């Protein structure tokens, strides 16, 4: 069994933490805010339903990034995209060459940003990987209750350095089986991430509705005209990918 640290305690972070705990791994779950742990602490664990069923015991919960990542063989960054730059700077000062960090999912350039911070800190980098989508399709359906609709198969993963992709896949296998596959390179994986295409236009073009809502009504925001904007952005993404080969 391995030691896995999850950075981010939202739906994806809790899904991974719960699943890995059920599989018998040592799990550390990090958040910048204690409030994210209140439900897990009060209930004594994480309840999983759907594609994974079970009640996982409470993992190590910490707001100290050093405590979370020190000695962990694998670190999963499951934080929102806007936090990747912050965590890249923090992790570059902490991670050691023998560790593996996976942005899951990343955004175009997440792994490159971490590599840049390693260079700025003049430190030898660890093995860095990113995916275009989360392995887990999941939602929080209540405090410390995660519904996993599916665990995806054949999710492309790319690494820095590129030549280490097979090593990363082998190191992730004890945790996630063979669900990750070689994604060629980080540019290909980054351009395969459709989150910005599908999520940003509905939110921006419905900004008043979003501001007035207690909870983001993401799946009710797409009108026929907004769908045209999404399609236009996606065509641009695909054209860029084709031009870059």
Where are these predicted regions, by residue range?
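Short, well-ordered alpha-helix to beta-strand connector turns
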Residues: 24, 58-59, 72, 98
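Nucleotide donor/acceptor-binding cores
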Residues: 2, 126, 153-155
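Active-site-lining helix/loop region of Rossmann-like oxidoreductase modules
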Residues: 153-245
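Rossmann-like NAD(P)(H) cofactor-binding subdomain of soluble oxidoreductases
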Residues: 76-77, 81-144
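NAD(P)+-binding Rossmann beta1-loop-alpha1 motif at the extreme N-terminus of oxidoreductases
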Residues: 1-50
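Short acidic low-complexity segments
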Residues: 54-71
């Amino acid at each position: 069994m391995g030691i896995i640290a999850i950075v981010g305690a939202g739906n994806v972070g809790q899904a991974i933490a719960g699943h890995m705990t059920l599989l018998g791994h040592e799990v550390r779950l990090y958040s910048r805010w204690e409030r994210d742990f209140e439900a897990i602490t009060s209930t004594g664990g994480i309840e999983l339903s759907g594609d994974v069923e079970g009640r996982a015991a409470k993992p190590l919960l910490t707001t100290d990034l050093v405590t979370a990542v020190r000695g962990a063989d694998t670190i999963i960054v499951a934080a929102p995209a806007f936090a990747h730059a912050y965590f890249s700077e923090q992790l570059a000062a902490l991670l050691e060459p023998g560790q593996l960090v996976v942005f899951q999912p990343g955004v175009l350039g997440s792994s490159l940003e971490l590599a840049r911070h390693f260079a700025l800190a003049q430190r030898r980098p660890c093995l860095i990987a990113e995916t275009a989508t989360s392995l887990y399709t999941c939602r929080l359906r209540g405090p410390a209750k995660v519904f996993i609709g599916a665990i995806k198969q054949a999710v492309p993963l790319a690494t820095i350095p590129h030549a280490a992709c097979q090593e990363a896949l082998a190191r992730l296998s004890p945790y996630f089986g063979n669900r990750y596959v070689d994604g060629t390179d980080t540019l290909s994986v980054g351009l395969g991430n459709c989150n910005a295409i599908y999520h940003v236009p509905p939110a921006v073009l419905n900004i008043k509705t979003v501001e007035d809502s207690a909870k983001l009504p993401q799946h009710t925001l797409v009108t026929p005209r907004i769908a045209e904007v999404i399609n236009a952005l996606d065509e641009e993404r695909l054209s860029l990918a084709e031009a870059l080969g």
